């Protein structure tokens, strides 16, 4: 039986693990050969010292080697936040996914239940009536017929069951928050990824480049793991093999600046109701932040020329009823009913 203890000692000493060692350590954890306390100790040793790009890449390699894949079109994208930002905000990326799909871009959405917040993507989508435990074939059909499929992380990364209890007991963000957006079961090549701290912007853009992404924006919104309308958003954009950084304010793209309090969400049922309200065309700060993120996603997808163009397309997706129609189709297909 392989032993995690040498890797714990190495991480705790402050020494970075090479990619091969990181993969080996995650292979041990993902195959059930480590105790919950060993897993917790290893994850916190990495967090306190600070995870490195090779460690993240090694961990992703371990996860990808075990995942149940989903077939999606080549132009499909993911819109996902790492979580762990402690903001308790609405489910921005989930709502954004429907708007982007309504604008004609296939979305393979990867997500989980809440670990460090009150409502994760899976919690809100389940509250809306989506079967989050649909199998890979059904999800593939949902992407092709409805324009969006939701991939519930534990269904595709069953090896995660070995680390889940430790993550919940820790109750704080770990390297696994970084891994979810990098381990999409549909192997998408276009991503809008929100991170919980600005120091991860460029490292994650580099990891995505190493892992074969074509276009990606990694964003941090002044305390949110999404682009924000309550402050300034920092972006590390991977485009044409190059990574560039820039900032965006809501005013420069014609959106109203709101207060952080206006973006506060609640439990899953409350967040689901608010998400439905946005798709039904209700005006709110939640709608504005979804428009901003949708505009960016449409730029990443190559559907929009620039952010203002993307936001205009997002407005059309909502106001025409297209985004709401995507939700209704996904509910039907995920529950094995005709779209």
UniProtKB/Swiss-Prot annotation:
Q: Which cofactor does it need?
A: Mg(2+)
What Pfam families would the database entry show?
A: Glycos_trans_3N (PF02885), Glycos_transf_3 (PF00591)
Q: How is the co-factor bound, per the entry?
A: Binds 2 magnesium ions per monomer.
UniProt pathway: Amino-acid biosynthesis; L-tryptophan biosynthesis; L-tryptophan from chorismate: step 2/5
RNA-binding keyword on record: no
User: Which residues does the record give as anthranilate 2 binding sites?
Assistant: 167
Domain of life per record = Bacteria
Record keywords: Amino-acid biosynthesis, Aromatic amino acid biosynthesis, Glycosyltransferase, Magnesium, Metal-binding, Transferase, Tryptophan biosynthesis
Query: What name does this protein carry?
Result: Anthranilate phosphoribosyltransferase
